[in-house]
Design a protein with these regions (language model features):
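Nucleotide-activated chemistry modules centered on ATP-dependent adenylation/adenylyltransferase
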Residues: 1-266
Length: 266
């Protein structure tokens, strides 16, 4: 049927693009449903349970994601499971210096995700051109719909010296769930709680539904973050700080706005 074709096509894609790259290949593992499905497709297509997985722990992951990553690791004992984490900087301390991240100023990605991941890759592979199997789908967002299924050293590849191949690029949301459930693949419990996407719990790109759920399931973190944002709004002179935060206007910030060090952000 149609889904069998989708699954078979993804496995053929992995075998074709993975040929000759066995010693310089990784699966990018985020703990989300797409990366979980991708990892399973890659392992089965290559019949290689030892493939390296790289998990970027931004320190802002859902607690459920950390639990799931550990569970995944135990369920795949032959896989080399590496963790990239920024242990030098604290998210809140950086926010105090340069202001919280916003949709147009996501400094957190380079500092807490791509930077640590690049360091791990450099330690493992040096100057080798590596192949990364990535769990992105073009239906996830407008920006991702502009990606190519195989991309090499372009601006859309955030970490250089790698070819990014996306086996499930053409899959719809339903295809991902059909795969996970039919193949009996364990997945992140955050989805069972109602989240439709899994990432950083305080990301300015999170929708209202995710924010609502986080107030329920991560109430202490959510309240601490809201208090910080309200204090920040007062610091930069917003007349109604609570309304500025609760309406989501903080996400649209585009410049330093009263934060001296914000000009250092690249």
């Amino acid at each position: 049927d149609a889904f069998d074709f989708v699954q078979d096509e993804a496995e053929k894609f992995v075998r074709k693009n993975g040929a000759g790259s066995e010693n310089r290949m990784i699966v990018s593992f985020s703990g989300g449903k797409e990366s979980t499905a991708t990892a399973d497709v890659v392992i089965k297509a290559l019949a290689n349970p030892k493939i390296t997985h790289l998990f970027g722990n931004t320190t802002l992951e859902f607690p459920m994601t950390i639990d799931y990553a550990e569970r995944y690791r135990k369920n795949h004992p032959l896989a080399e499971f590496r963790i990239a984490k920024n242990t030098d900087q604290n998210f809140y301390e950086v926010c105090k210096e340069i202001g919280p991240p916003a949709r147009m100023m996501r400094w957190c990605c380079s500092m807490f995700k791509t930077g640590p991941i690049t360091r791990v890759l450099n330690r493992k592979f040096g100057d080798k051109q590596i192949l990364t199997f990535y769990g992105i789908r073009k239906n996830e967002s407008v920006s991702r719909s502009k990606y190519s299924r195989v991309t090499e050293n372009t601006e859309t590849v955030k970490i250089q010296k790698q070819t990014v191949a996306s086996p499930i690029f053409e899959w719809k949301d339903l295809d991902v769930w059909l795969y996970l459930l039919s193949e009996k693949v364990d997945f992140n419990d955050a989805y069972r709680l109602g989240y439709d996407r899994v990432g950083c719990w305080c990301c300015p790109n999170n929708n209202l539904r995710a924010q609502f759920l986080s107030r329920i399931y991560m109430s202490e973190r959510s309240e601490k973050w809201r208090s910080f944002l309200v204090d920040f709004a007062r610091q930069i002179g917003k007349p109604d700080a609570e309304e500025y935060v609760d309406s989501g206007k903080w996400k649209a910030r585009q410049g330093g706005n009263g934060v001296a060090a914000a000009g250092d952000v690249k």
